[in-house]
Amino acid sequence: MYKVYPDERIDVKKEQQLIEQYDHIVFQFPLYWFSMPPLLKKWLDEVLTYGWAYGSKSGYKVGGKKVTLAISAGIDEREYAHNEKYKYTLKELLRPFELTFEYIHADFRPFFAYYGIELNSTTEWIERSVPLYRQFLEEFAKQ
């Protein structure tokens, strides 16, 4: 997204038209301070507008579309637990996405996460995620 919008000026109409073309949507991003990167938050704020994504006049343009997240997380999966350092599961941290997409009547589906990338950023570690991610996408496409 930063490559498409280096000035961070999002072409809202273009993005809305792109979303309207597909029934399955994947938001892929690195977990950033236990949330989304700033430009993705801006994208959600600017693209999911009243009268298009929600509201009485909208027709809920994202409604019924299957939406998921694909996340790279810096820390190990085991650390996302109530009895560990970060106190919350990744699913709990992603609840705002679930609520956002439910609010606009999208079909929010289970997410994909690849953990431990902060300490294991070797090419080999990253390449291990490829078949897992490919399988996730293939299964998501069948839903």
PLM regions: where:
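Glycine-rich phosphate/pyrophosphate-binding loop and the adjoining helix
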Residues: 94-143
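N-terminal beta1-alpha1-beta2 submodule of the flavodoxin-like/Rossmannoid cofactor-binding fold
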Residues: 1-57, 131-143
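Generic recognition of short, well-ordered alpha-helical interface segments
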Residues: 35-42, 62, 92-96, 128
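Short, solvent-exposed loop/turn segments at secondary-structure boundaries
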Residues: 8-10, 81-83, 120-124
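Short, glycine-/small-residue-rich phosphate/pyrophosphate-handling segment
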Residues: 62-109
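Short, solvent-exposed loop/turn segments at secondary-structure junctions
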Residues: 32-33, 74-76, 116
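Generic structural signal for helix capping and beta-alpha/helix-loop junctions
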Residues: 4-6, 77, 118
